[in-house]
């Protein structure tokens, strides 16, 4: 039986968050913009900056907030963003696309996977809106995704833990089920005790000081939903995962 490394992926949407995640011990970065809206594709400059930290970085490929039903023109933008991630020297992309009924858009995802050939790829939480998650799991496997980021179709991974455990059982090692959404140091042990986990996703974010009376806020430039990566929370989460791994997690 070989040991399985426990990978902590931290999603960030600004340079300060990127640096906090690195200092806190993240193993991989999910690079986004506008996490308050669920995360969209970051700028080329942010991609280039992220490439200098020496960690694997996966870029969110999502041209806008809202649903995951994308037009032909939006798909073209997504391909160009994949090109930008590759040009920046980043290791992976985070993809997802739905049909009108919530099922995975197999044609578009296959096209995007082909366009990202040679890069690591994560299927994001578009998976969570699928009406049949077991069917979506098999679809993700057939598309060749190494992992799925999922909350088990719930608002948080902890709320969806039973579904996550079932998905992990059905996956049978064919694809990684990476829990995400609301993962905090205070709640992660309940996930770890529920099913075998080798990768976990978190933002470890906290709401920064926000003055609604400031001139910047009154002019509409500062959003109350903006959050900041908490380096201490990243470090605490990493410590818990490392202790769990040393406790005998094997494959």
From Swiss-Prot:
Taxonomic placement: Bacteria, Pseudomonadati, Pseudomonadota, Alphaproteobacteria, Hyphomicrobiales
Gene name tied to this protein: cutC
Family affiliation: Belongs to the CutC family.
Molecular function in Gene Ontology: copper ion binding
This protein's name: PF03932 family protein CutC
Cellular compartments annotated: Cytoplasm
UniProt cross-references to Pfam families, sorted A to Z: CutC
Keyword list, A-Z: Cytoplasm
SUPFAM superfamilies xref list: CutC-like (SSF110395)
GO CC terms: cytoplasm
PANTHER family: COPPER HOMEOSTASIS PROTEIN CUTC, COPPER HOMEOSTASIS PROTEIN CUTC HOMOLOG
């Amino acid at each position: 039986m070989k040991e399985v490394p426990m990978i902590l992926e931290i999603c960030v949407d600004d340079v300060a968050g990127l640096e906090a995640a690195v200092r806190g011990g993240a193993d991989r970065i999910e690079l986004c913009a506008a996490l308050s809206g669920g995360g969209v594709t970051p700028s080329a400059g942010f991609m280039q900056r992220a490439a200098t930290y020496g960690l694997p970085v996966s870029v969110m490929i999502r041209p806008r907030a809202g649903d995951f039903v994308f037009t032909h023109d939006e798909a073209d933008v997504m391909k160009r963003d994949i090109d930008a991630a590759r040009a920046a020297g980043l290791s992976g992309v985070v993809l997802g696309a739905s049909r009108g009924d919530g099922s995975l858009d197999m044609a578009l995802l296959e096209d995007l996977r082909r366009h990202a050939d040679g890069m690591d790829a994560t299927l994001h939480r578009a998976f969570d809106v699928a009406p049949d998650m077991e069917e979506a799991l098999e679809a993700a496997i057939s598309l060749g995704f190494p992992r799925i980021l999922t909350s088990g179709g719930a608002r948080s991974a902890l709320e969806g833990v039973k579904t996550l455990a079932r998905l992990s059982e059905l996956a049978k090692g064919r694809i990684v089920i990476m829990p995400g959404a609301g993962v905090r140091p205070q709640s992660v042990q309940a996930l770890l005790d529920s099913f075998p986990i080798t990768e976990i996703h978190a933002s470890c974010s906290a709401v920064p000081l926000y003055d609604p009376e400031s001139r910047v806020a009154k002019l509409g430039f500062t959003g109350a939903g903006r959050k900041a990566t908490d380096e201490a929370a990243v470090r605490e989460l990493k410590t818990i995962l490392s202790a769990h791994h040393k406790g005998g997690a094997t494959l």
